[in-house]
Amino acid sequence: MIFRSVSNTDFRARVRTLLLAGSTALAFVAAPVWAFSIDDVASKAKDLAGDKYSAPTSNLPSEFSEMKFADYQQIRFINERAYWGKLKTPFKLSFYHQGMHFDTPVKINEVTATTVKPIKYDRTKFDFGSLKFDENATKDLGYAGFRVLYPINQADKQDEIATFLGASYFRVVGKGQVYGLSARGLAIDTALPSGEEFPRFREFWIERPKAQDKQLVIYALLDSPRATGAYRFVLRPGKDAVMDVQARVFLREKVSKLGLAPLTSMYLFGSNQPSEQHNFRPELHDSSGLQIHAGNGEWLWRPLNNPKHLSVSTFSVENPKGFGLLQRGREFSRYEDLDDRYDLRPSAWIEPKGDWGKGTVELVEIPTPDETNDNIVAFWNPETQPEVGKPLDFAYRLHWTMDEDELHDPKSSWVKQTMRSVGDVKQKNLIRQQDGSTALVVDFEGPALKDLAPDAPVTTQVSTDSNAEVVENSLRYNPVLKGWRLTLRIKVKDPKKPVEMRAALVDEAQKPLSETWSYQLPADE
């Protein structure tokens, strides 16, 4: 190292210069850099919660508010005019026009590195088909919602991968998937006699993505008569779509039931509840069951029903590790529907971040005569609600996937299918005779079973409530699946009441070999 001598004066001058330069650099680093965050939305939500609720008012002319669904379908967004269409970013936005019950606009803003600006309604971005209307009456309208476009399936084609439309509903798909079940921001008093309250996203802020970005960040402000909230969504497209959700909710007043991370789906009929009418489709549903991974490590599977009466089931859990509505069984032969492709509809799996404490996973099943009604709801209901005006912070990861095998305990086994039929017994002449029982056939498969010998000492743990008598509980090896088949025949004591039952496979030491099968036979069936 070479030392160069300097005078004291030069040295002091150089030190003073360096100190000044350093202080300038420090000042530059310390200077606040503008950045939009969930705190900005939460501030608005908190202020809203302190004010009296003001219901949104419709600004739609009658020719739009009174239109039929077929007319609303004629209104098509011109994708060539997508927002960010000329920017070098893989994400684009298209918009929903107001119409029918989508009669109030939502504010949509774009967030850049330096500004927030509203995305204004532009009628010229839509093709209205053969609809006739006064163009002047639409000049001050807004958008009902928006879609996210991304080249998920082909590099040169923009596909719709997410949609936000109506109340606090949103849907997402991954590669090769088609829209099925929905998620919501918040559910209030679901299935209560007082009636359900549907909070709505009233304003959105969407970050303009850079060319290299593989994720899209969306903020939303939620409002309802008894709650407000701030939400941050980070959407990551892929084979499975993944969405990280961060929320801060404020109550205006106490609610009877608070539903966090709600999912909404449809179940019309399936193998565990066959159609009463002849139908070439063996099954017709967006989801086949509710899966729960409890904080104590237990895995539970509850096949869905389309009951004749409203049904609410609760599952007490502390610090859930996951829950969701899954579409188990991807074989096309289960559905045989070339138009609606129920075999390609995703499962939605909620993975809580942090400890959620004590509460219940609630499952609501509503009677429906057809597939146009969403009749299934699942959500987390915390045991303790926040005080009025105080924030409730929670976060979770939401997976939209067709790879249900990744959502099991990799060392256990699970229910492949549940089948229901009238019960019968085989007579000495080999003719089967119905005996007034109901038969439930449950196939289990998975790593815990596939390497066991057919004569391995696998047994069952079965329980039912007091409304049923078990007349058969048999277990046999299933060589097709390299698993085991459980057959239960029960006789219902009071058909006007449902029957609850549970079953699991265990080894000779009573150690679990499978998830818990939890089933409800609906009333009046």
Curated annotation (Swiss-Prot):
GO MF term set: carbohydrate binding; catalytic activity
Family designation: Belongs to the OpgD/OpgG family.
Name of the gene: opgG
Phylogenetic placement of the source organism: Bacteria, Pseudomonadati, Pseudomonadota, Gammaproteobacteria, Pseudomonadales
Protein name: Glucans biosynthesis protein G
One biological process term in Gene Ontology: beta-glucan biosynthetic process
Keywords assigned: Periplasm, Signal
Leader sequence residues: 1-35
General function of this protein: Involved in the biosynthesis of osmoregulated periplasmic glucans (OPGs).
Chief localisation class: periplasm
Protein source organism: Pseudomonas paraeruginosa (strain DSM 24068 / PA7) (Pseudomonas aeruginosa (strain PA7))
